[in-house]
Amino acid sequence: MRRPSMIRPFLVAIVLLAALPAAADALSPKQTERCKAMQATLAPKQAELLEATEKRDALAEQAEALGEQFEDAQVMRLASSSNAQAADAAKAEFDTARRAFAQAEYALQSSARQFNQDVADYNRSCTPAK
């Protein structure tokens, strides 16, 4: 499930990329070059965010599936010692998947925050005041 807050930076970047020619008319040649350089960094960062989002989503699905497997194994825990061992193994896998998901989520949020800051810097520097 994609979050609307992750889509917003992408839409902002697209609008900014389309607005560069209009903004360039009001800037000096030196500022225009700097803005073009800033603009060139936005697309790769946007692609990285998309990849990170896909990775996070895949890890979320994996953690969810392992969580369900753990719950199923937990129900049978008291039936035998082998079921208890299976439940312990399922819990360990689930915990590992949750940690991987949490790390991916944190990295994605950090990258999105930085991307939003870069877009704000671009807007501040490269968009003429009205």
Regions found by a protein language model. Give the residues of each.
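N-terminal secretory signal peptides that target proteins for export/translocation
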Residues: 1-6
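General structural signal for secondary-structure boundaries
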Residues: 14-15, 28, 34, 125
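N-terminal signal peptide c-region/cleavage motif recognized by signal peptidases
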Residues: 19-23
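Immediate post-signal-peptide N-terminus of mature secreted/exported proteins
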Residues: 24-73
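Short coil/loop "hinge" linkers that interrupt or connect long alpha-helical coiled-coils or helical hairpins
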Residues: 30, 129-130
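Amphipathic alpha-helical coiled-coil segments
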Residues: 48-52, 56, 89-128
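Short E/K-rich amphipathic alpha-helical oligomerization segments
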Residues: 57-100
